[in-house]
Amino acid sequence: MKQIKWGILGTGSIAKAFAEALKETDGELLAVASANGQRAIDFCNSYGGTAIEGHMNLISMPGIDAIYIATPHTSHFEFASACLKQKKAVLCEKPMTINATETMALIDLSRKNKTLLMEAFMYKIHPQTQKIFEIVNKRMKGPLSIKAEFCFSVDVPDTHRLVNRDLGGGSILDIGCYPMSISRHAIGALYDRNFVNPIKIQGEGELNNQDIDLNASAELIFEDGSVAKIRSATNLSSESDVTISDGEMTIYVNQPWHCGEFTGRESQIKIVNANDEEELIDIKTDKGIYALEIDHFTEAFFNEELESTLLPHNDSHGNTIALDQWRKELKVVYNDDRGEKRKVSVISKNDSRDTLLSTKIPGLDKNLSRIVFGCDNQSDTNHAFAMFDHFHSNGKMCSIQLIFTIMVRVITT
């Protein structure tokens, strides 16, 4: 396989796992960045590469093909945007961003700059997961009943990223994205689709003193009548397993997320039929789960693809939309969910706007663009501001709300 020259943003445990996995691939680690220069030095002493102080300094370095983003959730959008604008391919840790608006904007940047963007959901690449979806597709009928959990218990200070509001803490974003993802994919597998989004989400949970979810549960309702009950927690332990049933047969997976990574790269899928007869399917890989993810990304990179076939852009966007809805059930809100509180704008100013056809409306002293933007489908101020800014940055200046205001003005004068 051809070689990608990598940069890594972040020096935490997941960055270390990625750097270790790189040794199993043909990739080369060129540089590692941290806000703390000494941490970058310590990291590179163990895994190689050049230590860089400051994430943006690494992003602007020449000679790097792709960048793995392993920083806290609230920084994903800013760093991924900067990478894509410099045409550096991006493998971004899950969740791709804090909310669906940011994910939407990254996808747009990926397409505009013709640069690969992929969410790092390592479990989705693994043969075990693909086998699960194959069984669902070939041997099950809807509707399905799904139970999926990812829970653990840790005692961390309020400043830790898992529970810190300013760092995008909370169980839903950190690990709830897994049961949400596998539920959507299992339903999709029934219909030869990559995923199906739920039509209704009902959720509840426990919040900390920063109004961030320590644990959360949700019931997902799908159009075909399938139901998924999912749970995530950072203050409760569970088996963190997955079951998928159609009433006739049931799939049991006891290592759905790490797929045997910590048990000799061996895992097992159990199937029980209506007669309580068991079938065991053994899964074994020569490479670790993160190395498989890197190889998949590398193949997409050298095929000059903009997105992964197993983790396409619309999948990442759909999962983030569902996570947004789950958080809203618990009233978990981050500053980056509010357009008026964002520190980094979702849409960059476009200084080279094209001149569009315009028209004159009585009562106004300037022309308006002939293209009108509808204002009735924005989910929140964050989404609204992003859509309006994008509309205006492309040289368009007229909205339904503006037209309504003009009509009132004309009628009343």
Regions found by a protein language model. Name each.
Residues M1-Y47:
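N-terminal Rossmann-like dinucleotide-binding module
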Residues E53, C92, L117-E119, V253, ...:
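Hydrophobic residues in well-ordered beta-strands that form the structural core
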Residues A66, P72-H73, F77-F121:
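Beta-strand-loop-alpha-helix segment that lines the small-molecule cofactor/substrate pocket
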